[in-house]
Amino acid sequence: MSDIKVTLAVEDRAENQDTLSISEIVPRIVAERKSFVDVTEESLLEEIANCVADSADDNVKDEVDEKPDESPFDQHRLKLLENVKAAYNESALALDFVSLLISSVRPTSASTSMSPHLKTHIPVGSLGADRVPAPQVANEPGVGIGWKIESLTNARDRLKTCASRLRTEAAKEKTYWAGVASIAATGEVLFKVRNSDTRGLGIKYGFGDAGSKYRDPGIGVLKRSATGTVDFEPKEEVQKKFVRVTIKSEEGEVTKSVSNVYTRDSKPPTDPTLAAIHETRHALFEEELFFEIAREARLLTSRKVTVADGAVTVDLGEGDMVVIEWVEVPEEPTTTFAPSLANLFVLALRLLLANAHRQQLEKMRTPPAPLQSKGGPNPNPPLPILRPLLAHILHKRLVSRARRSLYLLSTTHSGLSFEITTNNSTDKESSSLGRLMAAPVSNLKIKFSDKGNAKVVIPSPLQSHQSMFDVTMFKGTSQETVTSHTGFHELVELEEWVRWAADRSEPKKSN
């Protein structure tokens, strides 16, 4: 079969002379023989004789080549048939042998598969077989003992491995729970984590229980490390930044004071896990502080408070400004408190945020108010952090300007005298924080010789619904008979009124 060749080549019609037409044969003859003038009868006879001799030689060669009797295909076919016949004979002999052997037990079933030749020459059931018992293996007790010893050895090694692992795990658990106990002893709030993906105890390092409503509740997990120590992992990543206050003057060209205090623990814990918890708590507090300051600053744009480039800028007037930023913690933060103006300012901001948390906690404990319409007040207003400080600073500057103006007027008017007093807080607000949260109010008493006196109330500058200067004029030296009551929104208006009242109170000069 391998000698049979099949080609897919296209037959060239020009090579087959039997299919050529006269118009195709004549040009070929002219190309081969040139002109017919040179063709003679003798040359044609000689050429025909040569062609006959060549064809005779080719026929002899073809007869010699076709002499073999059989092709390789026929040889392989005959060999295959011989193998098939041999296999058939062997299978027939095997079937007769098995049938004759079974005939001693089941004659009817065996005779159906026996060949006719076997049934004729050999009677059914003449071949039988007996079972040969297998030789019994001698019972060697040493083999069983060896297997038992090997099994006991493997069990001993596995038990030793398990005991060692349990001992290591017990030591790690002891270390872990000792660390958890030391953290719980410091007053940290621990709770069970009900999450299949997380194994460990939860810890609250945020200020949700203190009244904070910040987006990050401050929840972490105390996990056991590979060595058994306690690892603290916050649920949400907290950036290690802090609030820095810079006080500038001369339109921001000169820096007067910069806060540099970040670490608020007088004695930082020696436990690294507890130190990480405190550090994350401080960072979360600073993050919430700057968030609330920026949120509150958007409502104070009319008071020259701007939020730009990640900083809150408060213009205090007269070239002074306060810049509040949220910056990265330095590699070596300052641990000592320096009583600079910027440090006191940022300390007041932190105290005001803590006080706002306390107020929110008290509000959550009170019964809720009746349901209101959708047009009611904002249910989550900004916390009062920047406004109390800004109110006291602006009020103090306003009172100082009023004092300077009245002092200049008193030098030109002999009968003019004044006294400025600041209202003291009540007993409930006697602390520094209470005085800071209370709205600043100052009283200005002006005496115009013996003809009259005036009482000027200077409220908080942030209260836009009130006049900047509430003036009440009295007759004589007492404050019983009110002659006039008015209000001014600018210090210039108050100066003009005081000058006018002082001129009227002075005795007229005789000609």
Swiss-Prot record:
Keywords: Activator, Nucleus, Transcription, Transcription regulation. GO terms for molecular function: transcription coregulator activity. Gene3D superfamilies: 6.10.250.2620. InterPro entries: Mediator_Med17 (IPR019313). The keyword Transcription regulation applies. It comes from the Eukaryota. Pfam families: Med17. It is found in: Nucleus. One of its GO terms (biological process) is regulation of transcription by RNA polymerase II. GO terms for cellular component: core mediator complex; mediator complex. Component of the Mediator complex, a coactivator involved in the regulated transcription of nearly all RNA polymerase II-dependent genes. Mediator functions as a bridge to convey information from gene-specific regulatory proteins to the basal RNA polymerase II transcription machinery. Mediator is recruited to promoters by direct interactions with regulatory proteins and serves as a scaffold for the assembly of a functional preinitiation complex with RNA polymerase II and the general transcription factors. Belongs to the Mediator complex subunit 17 family. Component of the Mediator complex. This is Mediator of RNA polymerase II transcription subunit 17. It comes from Yarrowia lipolytica (strain CLIB 122 / E 150) (Yeast). The lineage of its organism: Eukaryota, Fungi, Dikarya, Ascomycota, Saccharomycotina. The gene is SRB4.
